[in-house]
Swiss-Prot record:
Protein name stated in the entry: Guanylate kinase
Domain Guanylate kinase-like: 6-191
CDD domains, A to Z: GMPK
Membership in a protein family: Belongs to the guanylate kinase family.
EC number of this enzyme: 2.7.4.8
Binding site for ATP: 13-20
Keyword Cytoplasm assigned: yes
GO annotation, cellular component aspect: cytosol
Primary residence: cytoplasm
One matching Pfam family: Guanylate_kin
SMART domains on file: GuKc
Origin: domain of life: Bacteria
Keyword ATP-binding among record annotations: yes
Record gene name: gmk
Length: 215
């Protein structure tokens, strides 16, 4: 993909690590709505699962049938796609590329498999792994929701351990023990990516041309 002003970020984490809360708080700190503003936004994925109460098509997800999803796969419309808990999820190529060209940072909320697929296609992607502070705390967070059976909780715990085993594949690691500290670390990562030479030259090209102009 051609160089773009916007930055692509991937956040991956086991269920219960607090990844979604961190993304939401980061965008709110930058005067965003829950999912987007003029400088950063969360990618809206396609999925075959049914909408949950309060979810809006095109805002939280693009809800499609399995048949439509399979057609999009055949047409090579996704950067990455995966089956999670019996449902398909995918990230649209066109939407991501158009958003980055506008200079808007994009956050992908995907697992390690998706991160690997996207990184292979866009090496400049910043991958961030959000980890819980301990195994005990992770189990507590999974249990306190009060929505799942012990079997479901154990299944999520097993999948969490599998996700954590790939932490070494990521560029950055944020341990979400103290939420405020974890949010500050995430914000620092975003700032550092924006301040890289390549991005600053694109952003301030006219400035440097003026500074270096002959009298």
């Amino acid at each position: 993909m051609p160089q773009s002003l916007g930055n692509l970020f991937i956040l991956a984490a086991p269920s219960g690590a607090g990844k979604s809360s961190l993304i939401k708080a980061l965008l709110q700190n930058h005067d965003a709505t829950e999912i987007h503003n003029n400088e950063m936004q969360v990618s809206v994925s396609h999925t075959t699962r049914a909408p949950r109460p309060g979810e809006i098509d095109g805002v939280h997800y693009h809800f499609v049938s399995r048949k439509v999803f399979q057609e999009l796969i055949t047409q090579d419309e996704f950067f990455e796609w995966a089956e999670v808990f019996g449902n398909y999820y995918g990230t649209s190529k066109v939407v991501i590329e158009q958003t980055l060209r506008k200079g808007i940072d994009v956050f992908l909320d995907i697992d390690w498999q998706g991160a690997r697929q996207v990184k292979a296609q866009i090496p400049d992607t910043a991958t961030i792994f959000v980890a819980p502070p301990s195994r005990e705390e992770l189990m507590r967070r999974l249990t306190e929701r009060g929505q799942d059976t012990p079997e479901v909780i154990q299944d999520r715990m097993n999948k969490a351990v599998s996700e954590i085993s790939h932490y070494h594949e990521f560029d950055y690691i944020v341990v979400n023990d103290d939420f405020t500290a974890a949010l500050a670390e995430l914000d620092a990562i975003v700032s550092s990516r924006r301040l890289r030479k390549e991005k600053q030259v694109m952003r301030h090209q006219s400035l440097f041309e003026n500074l270096l102009a002959s009298d």
